Amino acid sequence: MPIELIFNEGPNDLFVVRVAGNGLGHDVLGSLWYALEHLRESLRLVVILGHSGCGAVSAAVDAFLHPLGYLSVSTSYSLRGILDRLLIVVEAAARKLAATYGSNVVEQPGYRDALIAAAVAGNVAQVAFTVQRELAGLGLNELRAVHGVYRLETREVWVPPGTADSPTRLAHPPTDLAAFDQLGDAIAKSDLIAQNLGR
């Protein structure tokens, strides 16, 4: 999906960097710094946008749920690097779902989809947090990083309840561990996750 269409922008109005699982490798950070260096006058916002059913997050969820399946990926350094980073977010999402719905939530038919949705939302928040810290480290405190999840099935950008920023309607990243914990609760208790679990 062209990002320009999602945000109703024209060609070249946005500087877009696409990467599996929203990973912040050297190439991605280099691309962001290029934009900061050469487009600074017009750059106002850094948006980290995940999407429902993300293939990289789905693969990490499957590795989490079925660790033996991870063995086929473990010999591929590049794929393993993506999944290893995402497994941290997946595990955090799994813990929040268990805390919210009970440990037997893993037996519910929609658990995999709920875990993917929660992990995608947590992942973009974590990446936005990291980008915001990088911007602050460069003295670019006027730039903000925000995040959201594009839902392919509804063609809308979703953010966890109570996190939307005005006027962007995207979410600010958490600022500390307590804020990450609160965000995890908001994601787990959201209608999106409840729907995936058939509640």
Give residue ranges: language-model regions:
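Gly/Ser/Thr-rich loops at beta-strand to alpha-helix junctions
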Residues: 1, 50-57
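N-terminal short beta-loop-beta anion/metal-coordinating cradle
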Residues: 1-16
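Divalent-metal-activated hydrolytic enzyme cores
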Residues: 12, 21-30, 37-43, 56-199
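Short, hydrophobic/aromatic alpha-helical segments in well-folded domains
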Residues: 2-4, 31-35
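Well-ordered alpha/beta subsegment
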Residues: 44-48
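Short His-Asn-centered micro-motif
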Residues: 17-20, 49-51
